[in-house]
Amino acid sequence: KIERLSKRGGGTVVVPAGKWYSGRIELKSNVELRLDEGAVIEFSGEVDDYQPAVFTRHEGVEVMGAGAFIYANGAKNIALTGKGVIMGPPMDVPMRKFPNGKSVVENDIDYRMPVKERLCDGKEGRTFYRPKSFSPINCKNVLVEGVTFERSLLWNVNPVYCENVIIRGVTVNSTDVPSGDGIDISSCKNVLIEYSTLNCGDDCFTLKAGRCEDGLRVNRPTENVLIRYCLA
């Protein structure tokens, strides 16, 4: 439905009150995903629901992996809004026990390998990096407003290579999640974060610009970020 709506010029997909179960959702240009009050989207804890691998960035290194519960690549004018909840799978799902790589990411990935060959999809014994909750990459004009993120598998809100991002009035609850960062901005430009409440067991806010040799290769800083009126 999202792709069809985008091809028609855009619009709003409304998730009504109730509990909904989903694998990865991909936002497309000119589409708003709005969660009504009382709507809960619980995302899958199965590796197969995050296939095929998509272009993403894990801990500052470009890979092909799970991406995020809600993902976008190369989209413009996208929004995730409303008073509903984005929720990860139950705390006892096997995916939560997967090692998030064999070691730190720079020891897992051969930087000489083309990015399209850096496959981290959890298949055939390959590394699996758990999906973030919301991670648009290479997007322009991104709005995240009002929603609550709970029980993440990894970082919650992680724009990458994005321009003109507004994150307003969101709530993050991830105190029991290892590496359950709140809002991580990675190589983005023109970002406003305001009126948000973050309760995290790891970093509440981070500003990133790539890691080690891969970060130097990409050479994209994070710039012009304003964080104000938040509780963390």
Segments and roles (model prediction):
Residues K1-A232:
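Extracellular/periplasmic carbohydrate-active domains that bind, remodel
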